[in-house]
């Protein structure tokens, strides 16, 4: 029998607001335990929440960017459950009336582009943190209580672990483009739970699902889903039953393990929070936020192809991060050569960022300076080979390319008389290779080019060298 994998993802995105969702406490990470707190965080009697306007705006922006319907009125609800690091005994969330619903995210698969539908995007607050690694005691840190989250829930449209990873990466890309979160999975700014089930191929009814937690990287998301799908199939093939439960992914043992029985929505006894008025999104706010939306990656990539003529693949790489796309456009403005800018940003710049493990914001070579380097190549002042040496010197010194070229005498030699004399010397010094070339072994032409470039320490203009060599050898 063959089975079909069915996956839906619940993604929690921690917003990068300065203050919490329902009070004015700081959201700064890494502060001493229980210092970013107030009576609202601690659920002291009489403390009342006040919704952070920025949280609403970020939710609407994400909804607009994913083609959701934005509710003009939505309700904040209490999700009731006990957890030691949840002082109130409930979490402020949304249930029946979320702020955004029925959206979509496109992903590229082996079969082409696919639309993953979104059920909803809703606002909620984070819980605190239990600390178990200090002696035999457990401590509670409520600094994180009330930090704003957006939960993005997909329909069960995902059919492979690879699709799940692609969807998550595309969603993260959109979130980062909007600037509402850094989307860092390793640090918990982006968290993903996967609802996994299998069914016989061609069946319409879904199988029993399990929820997988504790996946802190794209690779772990793929591995956990693949493992859980195989576990489901093995259980069913052996006549067993899949139970609805929550399971944890153990990255060390590369397996999922049971955590608890999976709750149903009605177990949480959701009801509207009486301390918070409904969220109103009026026409003026909606129009303003639409105007504030940045150009999203797919649209930007299409524009790059249309306006600059670079290949679609290049455009996709360059728009993978908003800051890289911004850098590329500034380089193009500085040098006027989009293809050269694309090659250098995708090559030397991204290589350096990866080696140094830094974002483009901390890159020491400004786009204007890189554009200056490319101008020197375009004018024939230096060769591409020398340009790479100059680039390394720019990284080390912070100097402009032109200053480095002048100071170190790296300018390309294009003087035909000087090059012609050198070429003649090399031809006379290698009669055997000349005879091979003239007998039809033209591939040896590269040998002569190499000898010329070596003699002039890479500074000879390769175009001039090729022209003169051709004339001399064919003459």
Swiss-Prot record:
Similarity comment text for this entry: Belongs to the GatB/GatE family. GatB subfamily.
Annotated source species: Chlorobium phaeobacteroides (strain BS1)
EC assignment: 6.3.5.-
Enzyme class: ligase
Alphabetized PANTHER family for the sequence: GLUTAMYL-TRNA GLN AMIDOTRANSFERASE SUBUNIT B MITOCHONDRIAL AND PROKARYOTIC PET112-RELATED, GLUTAMYL-TRNA(GLN) AMIDOTRANSFERASE SUBUNIT B, MITOCHONDRIAL
HAMAP family per UniProt: GatB
Pfam families the record matches: GatB_N, GatB_Yqey
Gene behind the chain: gatB
Catalytic activity: L-glutamyl-tRNA(Gln) + L-glutamine + ATP + H2O = L-glutaminyl-tRNA(Gln) + L-glutamate + ADP + phosphate + H(+); L-aspartyl-tRNA(Asn) + L-glutamine + ATP + H2O = L-asparaginyl-tRNA(Asn) + L-glutamate + ADP + phosphate + 2 H(+)
The protein's name: Aspartyl/glutamyl-tRNA(Asn/Gln) amidotransferase subunit B
Keyword Ligase: yes
GO biological process: glutaminyl-tRNAGln biosynthesis via transamidation; translation
InterPro entries assigned to the protein according to its UniProt record, in alphabetical order: Asn/Gln-tRNA_amidoTrfase_suB/E, Asn/Gln-tRNA_Trfase_suB/E_cat, Asn/Gln_amidotransferase, Asn/Gln_tRNA_amidoTrase-B-like, GatB, GatB_C_1, GatB_Yqey_C_2, Gln-tRNA_amidoTrfase_suB_CS
NCBIfam families registered for this protein in UniProt: gatB, PRK05477.1-2, PRK05477.1-4, PRK05477.1-5
GO function term, MF aspect, one: glutaminyl-tRNA synthase (glutamine-hydrolyzing) activity
Keyword Endoplasmic reticulum: no
Functional summary from the UniProt entry: Allows the formation of correctly charged Asn-tRNA(Asn) or Gln-tRNA(Gln) through the transamidation of misacylated Asp-tRNA(Asn) or Glu-tRNA(Gln) in organisms which lack either or both of asparaginyl-tRNA or glutaminyl-tRNA synthetases. The reaction takes place in the presence of glutamine and ATP through an activated phospho-Asp-tRNA(Asn) or phospho-Glu-tRNA(Gln).
Record's subunit section: Heterotrimer of A, B and C subunits.
Keyword vocabulary terms for this entry: ATP-binding, Ligase, Nucleotide-binding, Protein biosynthesis
């Amino acid at each position: 029998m063959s089975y079909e994998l069915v996956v839906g993802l619940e993604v929690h995105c921690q917003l990068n607001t300065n203050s919490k969702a329902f009070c004015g406490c700081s959201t700064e990470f890494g502060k001493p335990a229980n210092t970013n707190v107030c009576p609202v965080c601690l659920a002291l009697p009489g403390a009342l929440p006040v919704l952070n306007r920025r949280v609403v705006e970020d939710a609407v922006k994400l909804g607009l960017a994913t083609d959701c319907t934005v509710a003009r009125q939505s309700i904040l609800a209490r999700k009731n459950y006990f957890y030691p690091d949840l002082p109130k005994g409930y979490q402020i969330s949304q249930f029946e009336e979320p702020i955004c619903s029925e959206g979509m995210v496109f992903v590229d698969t082996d079969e082409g582009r696919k639309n993953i539908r979104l059920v909803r995007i809703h606002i909620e607050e984070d819980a605190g943190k239990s600390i178990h690694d200090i002696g035999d005691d457990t401590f509670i840190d409520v600094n994180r209580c009330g930090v704003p989250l957006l939960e993005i829930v997909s329909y069960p449209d995902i059919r492979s672990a690879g699709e799940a990873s692609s969807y998550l990466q595309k969603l993260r890309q959109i979130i980062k483009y909007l600037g509402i979160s850094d989307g860092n999975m390793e640090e918990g700014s982006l968290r993903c739970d996967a609802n996994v089930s299998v069914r016989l191929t061609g069946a319409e009814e879904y199988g029993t699902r399990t929820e997988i937690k504790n996946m802190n990287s794209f690779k772990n998301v793929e591995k956990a889903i693949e493992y859980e799908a195989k576990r489901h199939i093995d259980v069913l093939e052996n006549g067993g039953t899949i139970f609805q439960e929550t399971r944890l992914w153990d990255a060390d043992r590369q397996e999922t393990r049971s955590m608890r029985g999976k709750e149903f929505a009605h177990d949480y006894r959701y009801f509207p929070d009486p301390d918070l008025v409904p969220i109103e999104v009026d026409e003026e706010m909606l129009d303003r936020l639409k105007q504030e939306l940045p150009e999203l990656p797919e649209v930007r990539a299409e524009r790059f192809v249309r306006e600059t003529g670079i290949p679609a693949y290049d455009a996709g790489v360059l728009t993978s991060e908003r800051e890289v796309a911004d850098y590329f456009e500034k380089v193009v403005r500085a040098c006027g050569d989009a293809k050269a800018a694309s090659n250098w940003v995708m090559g030397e710049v991204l290589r350096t960022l990866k080696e140094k493990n830094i974002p483009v914001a901390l890159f020491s070579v400004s786009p204007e300076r890189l554009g200056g380097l490319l101008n020197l190549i375009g004018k024939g002042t230096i060769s591409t080979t020398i340009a790479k040496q100059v680039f390394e010197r720019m990284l080390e010194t912070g100097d402009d390319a032109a200053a480095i070229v002048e100071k170190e005498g790296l300018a390309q030699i294009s003087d035909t008389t000087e090059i012609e004399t050198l070429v003649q010397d090399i031809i006379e010094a290698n009669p055997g290779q000349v005879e091979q070339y003239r007998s039809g072994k033209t591939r040896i032409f590269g040998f002569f080019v190499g000898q010329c470039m070596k003699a002039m320490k890479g500074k000879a203009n390769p175009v001039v060298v090729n022209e003169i060599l051709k004339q001399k050898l064919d003459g």
